[in-house]
């Protein structure tokens, strides 16, 4: 989008704060329904970030796939859960929570120490005039399809297998 710089900066700060508040809502809210709605807010904010970056196809895909399908599936699964069983076995602190805290803290500390030491100016950013002219003949969705079937084939297939395992796990949990 060709927005004025002040409006673009304001939207970045607004979407960033919405993203942070939504993520905190996903993690900190005890009601799973509210947590799922907060996840929807996070996914919509990410989609709006893509729109600000002029990636309209990715933004539409984000809205359709994640917000329109996966988040709704999560909300339906949470609504089918028996809430009395969910709150009955609630422990304040478990061993898994301690391990998760240690892992997340170590990742956070490593990121905090690595990011300031990175030479961001050494990264080559591609700009529009420097790109190959033949790429203009192929539409954006065709470029995405070409990259998914060549360069990103293995990660794309791994993500599809992970989603398949998650759906099978959801079906198994729903049957019990």
From Swiss-Prot:
NDH shuttles electrons from NAD(P)H:plastoquinone, via FMN and iron-sulfur (Fe-S) centers, to quinones in the photosynthetic chain and possibly in a chloroplast respiratory chain. The immediate electron acceptor for the enzyme in this species is believed to be plastoquinone. Couples the redox reaction to proton translocation, and thus conserves the redox energy in a proton gradient. It is a multi-pass membrane protein. InterPro entries: NAD(P)H-Q_Oxidoreduct_6, NADH_UbQ/plastoQ_OxRdtase_su6, Nuo/plastoQ_OxRdtase_6_NuoJ. It catalyses: a plastoquinone + NADH + (n+1) H(+)(in) = a plastoquinol + NAD(+) + n H(+)(out); a plastoquinone + NADPH + (n+1) H(+)(in) = a plastoquinol + NADP(+) + n H(+)(out). Keywords: Chloroplast, Membrane, NAD, NADP, Plastid, Plastoquinone, Quinone, Thylakoid, Translocase, Transmembrane, Transmembrane helix, Transport. Its EC number is 7.1.1.-. The chain crosses the membrane at residues 10-30, 32-52, 63-83, 92-112, 152-172. GO terms for molecular function: NADH dehydrogenase (ubiquinone) activity; quinone binding. This is NAD(P)H-quinone oxidoreductase subunit 6, chloroplastic. Belongs to the complex I subunit 6 family.
């Amino acid at each position: 989008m060709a927005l004025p710089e002040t409006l673009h900066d304001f939207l970045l700060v607004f979407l960033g704060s919405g993203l942070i508040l939504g993520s905190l809502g996903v993690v900190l809210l005890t009601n799973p329904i509210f947590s799922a709605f907060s996840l929807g807010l996070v996914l919509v904010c990410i989609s709006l970030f893509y729109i600000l970056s002029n990636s309209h196809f990715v933004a539409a895909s984000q809205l359709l796939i994640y917000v329109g399908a996966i988040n709704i599936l999560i909300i339906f699964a949470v609504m089918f859960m028996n809430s009395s069983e969910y709150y009955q076995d609630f422990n304040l602190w478990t061993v898994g929570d301690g391990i998760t805290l240690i892992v997340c803290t170590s990742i956070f500390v490593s990121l905090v120490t690595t990011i300031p030491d990175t030479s961001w100016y050494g990264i080559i950013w591609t700009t529009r005039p420097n790109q190959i002219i033949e790429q203009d003949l192929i539409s954006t969705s065709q470029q995405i399809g070409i990259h998914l079937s060549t360069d990103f084939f293995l990660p794309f297939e791994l993500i599809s297998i992970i989603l398949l395992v998650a759906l099978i796990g959801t079906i198994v949990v729903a049957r019990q």
